[in-house]
Amino acid sequence: MSAKRVFEKFDKNKDGKLSLDEFREVALAFSPYFTQEDIVKFFEEIDVDGNGELNADEFTSCIEKMLKEVFVFCDVDGDGKIPASESYVTMTSLGKKFTEETSAEKVRAADVDGDGYLNFDEFMALVIGDI
């Protein structure tokens, strides 16, 4: 699933924009660990035009920013990749309720180049695909 499809899924009234309430649902789908304060702060930061709603471009930018922060946090040695063997820890840090086996299966599917690591694009596809 792409960021655009996530946008469409959570745009409940199909007006082409996400309200703060709709965005809150998205953020909590990514991770139940986001506080209301975090969500409002993210929303205000990415609402570039300040109209109180997110359009698809603002939303896509937000998704990438949120996931980049999580990725950098999980990329302990800063080499731009997360070992697939640590995927269970990574996914549970996002609040995902996977078994180690399920996590390993999802990572194997996301590790497109088969190098045993998740780069940012693979990581993003893995997390977005789970929403």
UniProtKB/Swiss-Prot annotation:
Signal peptide range in chain numbering: none
Annotated binding of Ca(2+) 2, by residue: 47, 49, 51, 53, 58
InterPro entries in alphabetical order: Centrin_CML-like, EF-hand-dom_pair, EF_Hand_1_Ca_BS, EF_hand_dom
Domain EF-hand residue range list: 1-33, 34-69, 70-97, 98-131
Keywords of the record: Calcium, Metal-binding, Repeat
PROSITE patterns membership: EF_HAND_1 (PS00018), EF_HAND_2 (PS50222)
Keyword NAD: no
Example of a GO MF term: calcium ion binding
Residues annotated as binding Ca(2+) 1: 11, 13, 15, 17, 22
Gene3D superfamilies: EF-hand
Positions with a binding annotation for Ca(2+) 3: 111, 113, 115, 117, 122
Alphabetized SMART domains for the sequence: EFh
PANTHER family documented for this protein: CALCIUM BINDING PROTEIN
Function description: Potential calcium sensor.
Name this protein carries in UniProt: Probable calcium-binding protein CML34
The species this protein was found in: Arabidopsis thaliana (Mouse-ear cress)
